[in-house]
Amino acid sequence: MGLETVIKDIMSAAQTEVNVINADADAEVSQILDDARQTAKKIMGDRLAKAEDDIKRLRQQEISSANLEVKRAMLNARKEVLDKVYNNAIDSIVSLPGSKQEELLKAIIDENDSNGSNIYSNKDSEKLVRKLSSLEYAGNIDCIGGLTIENSDGTVRLDYTYDMILKNVNEQSLKQTSDILFG
């Protein structure tokens, strides 16, 4: 009987040790699983946060892009309107009555005749310029109206064509014109 008791004691101690080892293993497995779950949750949370940030960034880029397109379209529309106003001004100048043309040319010539020796104009204004100016008529130039005065050696040209005057006025008052048209 002594051997059986020793065997039982050994078996009981072994079983207790196995139970302790199994409990420790179960606890370690449980801890590993909990850690893995926590790590997975953190990874999922990080990825979800990154995905949300990416979505916000993409949305902001799309909004910015759309705003830029709207501004570009508005600027193009405004430019078209300003170009139309400019072209209407050209049409108005071209269709001025003869008396108004003569009045404008006379004012330019009276102011600047002494600054040169040659004068140029477009073909339509040639007779009128010859009549109004004492300068030598030097030929026709391509313009909607007005004239150009040149000194005797051709080194200085004063451009009083309506094209140049309108261009200068347009450049100087573009912002004001835009403010009037578009508020």
From Swiss-Prot:
Gene3D superfamilies assigned to the protein according to its UniProt record, in alphabetical order: F1F0 ATP synthase subunit B, membrane domain
Keywords per UniProt: ATP synthesis, Cell membrane, Hydrogen ion transport, Ion transport, Membrane, Transport
One Gene Ontology MF term: proton-transporting ATP synthase activity, rotational mechanism
Keyword flag Phosphoprotein: no
One Pfam family hit: vATP-synt_E
Signal peptide limits: none
Topology term for the membrane: Peripheral membrane protein
Biological processes, Gene Ontology terms: proton motive force-driven plasma membrane ATP synthesis
InterPro entries: ATPase_V1_Esu (IPR002842)
Function: Component of the A-type ATP synthase that produces ATP from ADP in the presence of a proton gradient across the membrane.
Assembly: Has multiple subunits with at least A(3), B(3), C, D, E, F, H, I and proteolipid K(x).
Family: Belongs to the V-ATPase E subunit family.
Name the record gives this protein: A-type ATP synthase subunit E
Organism lineage string: Archaea, Methanobacteriati, Methanobacteriota, Stenosarchaea group, Methanomicrobia
